[in-house]
């Protein structure tokens, strides 16, 4: 399916995102008023793809307004007030992804032309402050609060940081990969059961073994339904499935990417909106919500699929495929 067909098909998802944006620009999780800054940025990528520039820049301005002087943003907002008073290291840097996506779609939307001087300085500060989260081996602590930095690094959060850094600077992050198992999940919690910990290193171009990717995918992929959030749970989630589609495309697993994406189309409801997840043993949608960021992930995956089909000369209109081109050239 080409992008124009997908664009029409997922118009309700885009409208759902816009309907949950406040006048200040915050994009809520759903109609209950919670806002996660990373999810907010994911929604901005989708709005850029749809060229909804008024809503896009309103969301960008909200983000910069809520950055503190240290280039950090609170981990969660409820009804536009901070509700979690710590900072997660991958949140603020992710704003570069929608900014670059906008520039790729329309050069007139180049953030270097549109952001104010103050905002551009804040953007640089985000990445300077990020160094304070980094340990001597190049691994990032996942959070900071009033007591200091968390003595733990998380795979998914770190890979999101790597994505942001590579999108901004077009250079691979330097870290001691031999210390991977020692550095990640130092709290003793095994997070390998989560599909995000499996596919995010591939999404970020840190891992590139296709055989290993497909073998690990078997632990999470339920044919005909999608990708599970947690290996042992009978629960497929639409955002994880969509992100896994992009991860597969980045490493040229086009057939499995299309298969997974086709699987999840059955979950688009009568209003054209996707739920967060589906518990297939109980045959219920769970949780009972239609999250904006889930619908954004579907849009991003559809866009990536459309332009992957057209080859590398056209793939630079999608920020993730643009990164794929960078991975392949290095």
Regions found by a protein language model. Give the residues of each.
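Structural helix-adjacent loops and short alpha-helical linkers that scaffold large soluble proteins
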Residues: 1-11, 47-61, 99-127, 166-178, ...
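Aromatic-rich carbohydrate-recognition surfaces in CAZymes
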Residues: 36-40, 44-136, 155-158, 162, ...
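Low-complexity, Ser/Thr/Pro/Gly-enriched N-terminal "stalk/linker" regions
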Residues: 1-38, 49-73, 124, 172-175, ...
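Extended ligand-binding clefts on enzyme/binding-domain cores
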Residues: 4, 12, 89-90, 113, ...
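CBM-like carbohydrate-recognition segments
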Residues: 32, 230-240, 246-330
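Acidic/His metal-coordination segments adjacent to aromatic residues that form catalytic metal sites
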Residues: 70-85, 141-151, 184, 223-224, ...
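Amphipathic alpha-helical elements of HEAT/ARM-like alpha-solenoid repeat scaffolds that form extended
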Residues: 95-99, 197-205, 245, 299
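Alpha-helical junction/boundary sensor with strong preference for TPR arrays
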Residues: 21-24, 67-70, 106, 130, ...
